[in-house]
Amino acid sequence: MLKLRLKRSGRKKQPSYRLVVMENTTRRDGRPVEQVGYYNTITKESYFDVIKIKKWLNYGAKPTQTVLNLLKKAKIIDQ
């Protein structure tokens, strides 16, 4: 099953995350199917490719709870 997940990147103690589409059995830092955005926890900067996110949600990908909260905050989805 496909999931919209956060993949950690950045330096030690300075995390930033990439929003990616992955199989749910893949490791956190494994190879994604596609990258659809990023989120920097230090500067609170984020970018989400709305077209790609909606495409993968229509294909049946499920967002994790953290990703769901980020997408709601960015007003991409409203549930």
Curated annotation (Swiss-Prot):
One of its GO terms (cellular component) is chloroplast. The keyword Chloroplast applies. InterPro entries: Ribosomal_bS16, Ribosomal_bS16_CS, Ribosomal_bS16_dom_sf. One of its GO terms (molecular function) is structural constituent of ribosome. The keyword Oxidoreductase does not apply. NCBIfam families: S16. Belongs to the bacterial ribosomal protein bS16 family. This is Small ribosomal subunit protein bS16c.
